[in-house]
Swiss-Prot record:
The name this protein goes by in its record: Aspartyl/glutamyl-tRNA(Asn/Gln) amidotransferase subunit C
Disulfide-linked positions: none
Described purpose of this protein according to its UniProt entry: Allows the formation of correctly charged Asn-tRNA(Asn) or Gln-tRNA(Gln) through the transamidation of misacylated Asp-tRNA(Asn) or Glu-tRNA(Gln) in organisms which lack either or both of asparaginyl-tRNA or glutaminyl-tRNA synthetases. The reaction takes place in the presence of glutamine and ATP through an activated phospho-Asp-tRNA(Asn) or phospho-Glu-tRNA(Gln).
Statement: the UniProt record of this protein carries the keyword Lipid metabolism: no
Record key words, sorted: ATP-binding, Ligase, Nucleotide-binding, Protein biosynthesis
Class in the EC hierarchy, top level: ligase
């Protein structure tokens, strides 16, 4: 598929990018190259091929889902300019 200069201008406008008039032919050529490559990918027979997310099989390491308090309340609140009863104290913003 070939992209003309007017289509390249429209794509740039829709993408909200400014492209100088002198650069439009190069942009049209690059977009045409991308679409040509996509057309080549569409010709590949992938029937029966299982999709993959990585070339090496990986498994996520799992850990127990245990609820804790984090043992960091004092540490975190020590950075607060104002803390009361274990919470951050902030100025009232709604009357």
């Amino acid at each position: 598929m070939s992209i003309d200069i007017e289509t390249a201008r429209r794509v740039a406008h829709l993408a909200r990018i400014r492209v100088d008039e002198a650069d439009l032919p190069a942009l049209a050529g690059e977009l045409s190259g991308i679409l040509t490559f996509m057309e080549q990918l569409n010709e590949v027979d992938v029937e029966g091929i299982e999709p993959m997310t990585s070339v090496t099989p990986m498994r996520l390491k799992r850990r127990q889902d245990v609820v804790t308090d984090g043992d960091m309340q004092d540490k975190v609140l020590s950075n607060a300019p104002d803390a009361r009863e274990g919470f951050f104290a902030v100025p009232k913003v709604v009357e």
